[in-house]
């Protein structure tokens, strides 16, 4: 290779994407190339010609590649044949880009690549000639490789200038950072692309974000169709007068431009401008307003604006004005002369203390924060419909406040108001009134009850101790009086016939008026934190529309009887001395879905509770006197999903049916110290699937032990570990004790170490099973047994005389999943089948190697058994002619068919998925299964050491070799095309043919690992 040829990664061409086609057909490849020719034309000469064989001392720019040079020797070769019209076009285009003279073969000038640095990065600012960099990059100004199209927009120059300024500024202030320069260059490039797309009529909006640019490119103000211009966190200093060229601009938004000090006069001459947003800028003033402006929305936020511009009253189309966190000291009286102004928002303007006398046509006024302490008279804001004054110094409302005939919504929160004017009763259009957190407000005027249109009233956090007569507020639907000194309700309170939601919490109420029962529209009643409230009126139980009743932290000891047809859905009584609930609650409150009676003095629940057929949640926590639940009351709760009995320390027993409730998902018994194991129903100790039982701490160990004894997988694992311990003792000490037939005795020290290693992990798994058994969601598998396996075990029990042997078989069979039980049930009738069932169970759930991997493969094993044609034939025969194929005979015939499937599954289980798939065809024959087992032992055995670890790393490579080997591909294609013999015969032929091939590839893999292990650094003998 010539010395000036660029280095490339082996196996990769530097221009590989240009030669990658998805079709093999040459005609389609030429079509692909033709479609790319227009965009790739400038660099095609570099693809068809190589650099010259000149030495490094030669002048590179004078180097030439001889015409028709051989790509290997640089010698003249054969004349390339014509490629048709495309070839002629390529040659013409190539000749046009070269510097050849007439009479001399024109070839493109090729520059040797002196560097392969990352293109266009600040870390490589010194671009040498020939470096592959991005053309015209501001970080590589001297680097040129490809001819670039002329930029008539000036955007590239603007990008270069802005980046240069940024770099100079960073260096000047000691903030130079290459990575930040890269990010800025990337953002500038994306901004340039965005502007170009808008220039191409791809949109009518420009959004620029986080750019350190003091000015926008001139071309921005030449986009005649631009409608929206927005900058966010751009370091703009000014906008040019050419802004007025954007005669279609509708929205102008500048946010985060701290150095933006002046707005050009042209902004008022934009005929289509409707919205102007100036947030977080440095503006202290605005230019004088000219006539003809179409501005409708003006927002100035977080800016040091000191005054509104002259001629502000000329904005005759301005409808919304928002001034937040500015330095305004006063508002121009011209605001009242704005005929279209509907919304005025003044938030957090610390120097603004008063409003102009007239607000004109303003319909919505928002005053949040600030020092405004008074409002204009009603005549100055006669159009007002919505008033919001929050966190303000407002101390008084105007006396004629009631003259605001259009006012519908008022919020006066956290102010210094002491009282309300009497004229407030004249606000007949008022719908919502919120008076929250006004600590100096102690009373309401008598006229307050005349607000006939009022629908929602909120009086929270005030000093109000009584309400005026409310008879006139007939439209009131929501009343909230929380955290007040309210001591009583008016006598005519029951006249609020439309009241639907009432909250009286944390007050000084002692009782509710008897006419509360007349509130027939009432749906929710909240009485929380009323410590002095001891009784409820009996009429309360006859509120047929009441859906939610909440009593918390009160002194109520008894609930009133419920009337027939009650609509109550939620009843909550907490932290109260309640001693009983109505005996007929289950009859009268059939719609009840949530019943919470916590921290009360209840001793028992009425039996009628069992008739609450819609009840979904029952909470009885921290009832220290609750001793029992009635069986008749619990067993009929068919819809209940959660029962909370936590903290019921005197509870000594539970209904036996509680764990059998069909929809129960959670039962909380934590803190029930009076319960014992004897008092727990079996349906809780061994819960059904999906039932979460939270036991008290003192019972968790006993419950776990009881569950572990009923868990077939745990018993299987314990038995397997016991036999392994016997086998290890026999191997180490030569005991004469008999060793279980399912456990082989290790014949050397390595075998004992391996068995001990796997036993250690099995003990950890057993400990996890014990912990899970004591947890709330532990559920034994006794209800997951297949019906066919139950029948098979019953048949085996009658024929087996040895009970311990049957117990082992029972544990093994029932530890399997449902689908595996279905496929193995036929094997239990014969001893040879029983042995296979126990082997499969111990392989998946025992203490052996790869148990977890084998467990995950069991569903696939079940599928293969179900789809095996000979097994299907035998089962069909036994079903049709049971006398000709009894269970013992069927089991004896099925076992040798299922045994190979199990052996193959056990061999490939720990292997990667690709290798498992590659070896599936081999598992039909004994030789193939033996080879798979050999690969498994060599790669995954505990005693394999470093060699096994290396082999495991190469297993995916082995799978790829098997899948791509030409012999394997040909054999599989041949078998798929021909239908000789039966499917079983074809599978056996395929396995017999592929086994030697895979054996050869496996031997090569082993040899490669062995070769790697013979290096001097890895050989202790050589080190010595």
From Swiss-Prot:
InterPro entries with a match to the protein in the record? Leu-rich_rpt (IPR001611), Leu-rich_rpt_typical-subtyp (IPR003591), LRR_dom_sf (IPR032675), LRR_domain-containing (IPR050216)
Bias-annotated ranges (Polar residues)? 92-102, 112-139
Q: Does the keyword Disulfide bond apply?
A: no
- The membrane-spanning stretches of this chain are none
Pfam families given in the database record: LRR_1, LRR_8
Where does it primarily localize?
Answer: secreted
Read off the Gene3D superfamilies from this record: Ribonuclease Inhibitor
Q: Where is the composition biased (Basic and acidic residues)?
A: 75-88
Q: Where are the LRR repeats?
A: 192-218, 223-246, 248-270, 271-293, 295-315, 316-338, 340-359, 360-381, 382-403, 404-427, 429-450, 451-475, 477-495, 496-519, 521-543, 544-566, 568-589, 590-612, 614-636, 637-661, 662-687, 824-847
Where is the stretch described as Disordered?
A: 50-139
PANTHER family associated with the record: LEUCINE RICH REPEAT-CONTAINING DOMAIN PROTEIN (PTHR48051:SF46), PTHR48051
Q: What is this protein called?
A: Protein PopC
Q: Source species, please?
A: Ralstonia nicotianae (strain ATCC BAA-1114 / GMI1000) (Ralstonia solanacearum)
Lineage of producing organism: Bacteria, Pseudomonadati, Pseudomonadota, Betaproteobacteria, Burkholderiales
The gene coding this protein = popC
């Amino acid at each position: 290779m010539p010395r000036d040829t660029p280095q490339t990664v082996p196996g990769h061409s530097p221009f590989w994407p240009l030669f990658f086609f998805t079709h093999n057909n040459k005609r389609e490849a030429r079509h692909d190339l033709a479609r790319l020719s227009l965009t790739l034309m400038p660099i095609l000469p570099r693809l068809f010609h190589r650099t010259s064989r000149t030495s490094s001392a030669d002048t590179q720019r004078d180097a030439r590649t001889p015409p028709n040079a051989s790509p290997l020797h640089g010698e003249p070769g054969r004349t390339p044949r014509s490629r048709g019209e495309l070839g002629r076009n390529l040659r013409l285009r190539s000749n046009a880009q070269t510097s050849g003279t007439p009479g001399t073969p024109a070839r493109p000038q090729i520059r040797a690549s002196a560097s392969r640095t990352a293109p266009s990065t600040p870390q490589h600012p010194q671009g040498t000639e020939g470096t592959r960099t991005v053309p015209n990059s501001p970080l590589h100004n001297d680097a040129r490789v490809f001819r670039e199209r002329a930029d008539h927009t000036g955007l590239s120059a603007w990008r270069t200038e802005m980046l240069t300024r940024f770099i100079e500024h960073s260096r000047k202030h000691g903030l130079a950072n290459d990575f930040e320069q890269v990010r800025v260059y990337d953002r500038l490039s994306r901004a340039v692309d965005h502007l170009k797309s808008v220039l191409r009529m791809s949109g009518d909006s420009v959004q620029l974000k986080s750019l350190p640019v003091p000015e926008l490119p001139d071309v921005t103000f030449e986009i005649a169709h631009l409608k929206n211009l927005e900058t966010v966190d751009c370091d703009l200093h000014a906008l040019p007068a050419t802004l007025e060229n954007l005669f279609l601009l509708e929205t102008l938004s500048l946010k985060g431009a701290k150095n933006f000090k002046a707005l050009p006069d042209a902004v008022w001459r934009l005929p289509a401008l409707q919205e102007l947003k100036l947030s977080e800028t440095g503006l202290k003033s605005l230019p004088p307003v000219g006539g003809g402006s179409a501005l409708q929305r003006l927002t100035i936020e977080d800016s040091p604006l000191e005054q509104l511009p002259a001629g502000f009253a000329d904005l005759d189309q301005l409808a919304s004005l928002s001034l937040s966190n500015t330095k305004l000291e006063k508002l121009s009286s011209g605001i009242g002369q704005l005929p279209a102004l509907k919304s005025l928002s003044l938030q957090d303007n610390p120097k603004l203390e008063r409003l102009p006398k007239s607000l004109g046509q303003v319909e919505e006024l928002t005053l949040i924060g600030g020092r405004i302490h008074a409002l204009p008279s009603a005549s100055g804001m006669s159009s007002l419909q919505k008033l919001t004054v929050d966190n303000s110094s407002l101390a008084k409302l105007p006396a004629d406040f009631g003259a605001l005939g259009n006012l519908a919504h008022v919020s006066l929160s956290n102010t210094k108001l002491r009282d309300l004017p009497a004229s407030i009763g004249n606000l007949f259009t008022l719908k919502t009134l919120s008076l929250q957190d006004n600590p100096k407000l102690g009373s309401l005027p008598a006229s307050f009850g005349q607000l006939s249109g009022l629908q929602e009233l909120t009086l929270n956090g005030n000093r109000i101790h009584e309400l005026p007569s409310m008879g006139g507020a007939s439209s009131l639907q929501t009343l909230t009086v929380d955290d007040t000194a309210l001591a009583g309700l008016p006598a005519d309170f029951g006249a609020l016939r439309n009241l639907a939601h009432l909250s009286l919490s944390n007050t000084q109420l002692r009782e509710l008026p008897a006419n509360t029962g007349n509130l027939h529209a009432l749906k929710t009643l909240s009485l929380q934190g009323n410590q002095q409230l001891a009784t409820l009126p009996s009429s309360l139980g006859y509120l047929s529309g009441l859906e939610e009743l909440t009593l918390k932290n009160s002194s109520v000891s008894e609930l009133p009887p419920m009337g027939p047809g009650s609509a109550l859905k939620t009843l909550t009584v907490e932290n109260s001395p309640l001693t009983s609930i109505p005996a007929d609650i289950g009859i009268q409150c059939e719609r009840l879905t949530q019943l919470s009676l916590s921290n009360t003095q209840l001793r028992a629940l009425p039996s009628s509770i069992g008739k609450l057929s819609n009840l979904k949640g029952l909470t009885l926590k921290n009832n220290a006197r609750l001793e029992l639940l009635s069986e008749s009351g619990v067993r009929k709760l068919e819809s209940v999903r959660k029962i909370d009995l936590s903290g019921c320390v005197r509870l000594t027993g539970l209904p036996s049916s509680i764990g059998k409730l069909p929809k129960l998902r959670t039962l909380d018994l934590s803190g029930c110290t009076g319960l014992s194991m004897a008092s727990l129903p079996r349906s809780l100790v061994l819960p059904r699937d999906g039932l979460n039982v939270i036991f008290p701490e003192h019972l968790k160990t006993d419950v776990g032990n009881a569950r572990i004894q009923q868990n077939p997988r745990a018993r299987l694992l314990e038995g397997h570990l016991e036999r392994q311990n016997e086998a290890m003792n026999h191997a180490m000490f030569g005991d004469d004790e008999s060793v279980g037939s399912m456990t082989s005795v290790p014949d050397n020290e390595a075998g004992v170490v391996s068995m001990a290693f796997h036993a250690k992990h099995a003990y950890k798994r057993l400990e996890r099973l014990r912990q899970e058994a004591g947890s709330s969601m532990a559920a034994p598998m006794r209800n997951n047994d297949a019906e066919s396996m139950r029948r098979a075990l019953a048949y085996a029990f009658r024929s087996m005389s040895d009970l311990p042997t049957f117990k082992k078989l029972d544990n093994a069979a029932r530890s399997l999943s449902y689908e595996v039980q279905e496929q193995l049930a036929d094997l239990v009738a014969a001893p040879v089948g029983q042995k296979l069932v126990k082997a499969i169970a111990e392989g998946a759930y025992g203490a052996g190697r790869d148990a977890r991997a084998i467990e995950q493969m069991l569903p696939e094993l079940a599928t293969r058994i179900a789809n095996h044609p000979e097994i299907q034939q035998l089962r069909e025969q036994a079903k049709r002619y049971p006398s000709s194929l009894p269970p013992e005979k069927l089991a004896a015939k099925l076992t040798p068919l299922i045994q190979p499937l199990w052996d193959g599954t056990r061999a490939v289980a720990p292997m990667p998925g690709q290798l498992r798939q590659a070896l599936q065809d081999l598992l039909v024959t004994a030789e193939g299964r033996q080879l798979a087992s050999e690969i498994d032992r060599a790669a995954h055995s505990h005693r394999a050491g470093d060699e096994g670890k290396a082999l495991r790393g190469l297993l995916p490579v082995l799978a790829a070799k098997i899948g791509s080997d030409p012999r394997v591909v040909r054999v599989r294609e041949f078998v798929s095309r021909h239908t000789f013999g039966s499917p079983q015969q074809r599978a056996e032929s395929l396995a017999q043919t592929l086994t030697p091939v895979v054996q050869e590839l496996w031997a090569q893999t082993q040899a490669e690992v062995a070769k790697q292990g013979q290096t001097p650094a890895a050989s202790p003998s050589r080190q010595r």
